[in-house]
């Protein structure tokens, strides 16, 4: 059975291939995948830390920030997205992260990546993922096909 998050991965990767053909990216297909105990143990040995984001876009870009009423742009070394299926609630009404060990671990990794010069975010659903990607990479750069 295909999970909602797996479909989201496929759709986002398809969008990137079609709309940003020169941009390099990698998605972690093993994320959420059912593995045998042996496969899971082997996979764990190759990882430094749990909760690594689902998608990495290897393209520098700019993100907008606001401070003291001023708007500026920061250059980032690449973008990491942790993709969540549509409807997943990450935050409480007061804006704090919901109590969930796995999501808290993911948020910690995203924070560390942001501190290291990357743009790292949660993206809930296809529309939010595409908006974050477009804000970071700019408008799609379709290749012209000449005959």
Residue ranges and their predicted role:
Residues 1-147:
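Catalytic phosphate/metal-binding cores of nucleic-acid and nucleotide-processing enzymes, i.e., regions
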């Amino acid at each position: 059975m295909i999970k909602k998050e797996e479909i989201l991965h496929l759709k986002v990767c398809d969008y990137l291939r079609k709309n940003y053909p020169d941009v390099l990216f990698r998605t972690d297909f093993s994320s959420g995948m059912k593995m045998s105990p042996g496969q899971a143990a082997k996979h764990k040995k190759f990882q430094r830390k749990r909760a690594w984001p689902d998608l990495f876009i290897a393209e520098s870009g700019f993100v907008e920030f606001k401070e003291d009423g001023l708007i500026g742009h920061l250059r980032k070394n690449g973008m990491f997205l942790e993709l969540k299926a549509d409807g997943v609630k990450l935050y409480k009404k007061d804006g704090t992260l919901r109590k969930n060990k796995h999501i808290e671990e993911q948020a910690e990794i995203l924070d560390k990546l942001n501190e290291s010069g990357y743009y790292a975010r949660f993206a809930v659903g296809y529309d939010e993922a595409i908006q974050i990607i477009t804000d970071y990479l700019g408008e799609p750069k379709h290749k012209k096909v000449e005959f």
